[in-house]
Amino acid sequence: MASEPRGSRKVKIGVVVSAKMEKTVVVRVERIFSHPQYLKVVRSSKKYYAHTELKVSEGDKVKIQETRPLSKLKRWRVIEHVGVVS
């Protein structure tokens, strides 16, 4: 079984859609792919709950990294503030 080496974690870039909780933000990650049969370009998005110590607000672009379970919903951590989406 060819698995990833220990310590490598998934990293995603998304937009903060909610920053109303303490030390928790909701990040929407958008994925663009071509439909396998119809070949139409499809957009889909998924929301992730992420732990943050940084000061981020709604509309900010952030980089999140997979981590151990921190609560019932939080499995991601904000590692970098990339910019602001206009």
Swiss-Prot record:
rRNA-binding listed as a keyword: yes
InterPro entries membership: NA-bd_OB-fold (IPR012340), Ribosomal_uS17 (IPR000266), Ribosomal_uS17_bact/chlr (IPR019984), Ribosomal_uS17_CS (IPR019979)
One Gene Ontology molecular-function label: rRNA binding
PROSITE patterns: RIBOSOMAL_S17 (PS00056)
Family to which the UniProt record says this protein belongs: Belongs to the universal ribosomal protein uS17 family.
NCBIfam families: PRK05610.1 (NF004123), uS17_bact (TIGR03635)
Quaternary structure (record): Part of the 30S ribosomal subunit.
Biological function: One of the primary rRNA binding proteins, it binds specifically to the 5'-end of 16S ribosomal RNA.
Protein name, per record: Small ribosomal subunit protein uS17
Organism the protein comes from: Chlamydia pneumoniae
Gene this protein is translated from: rpsQ
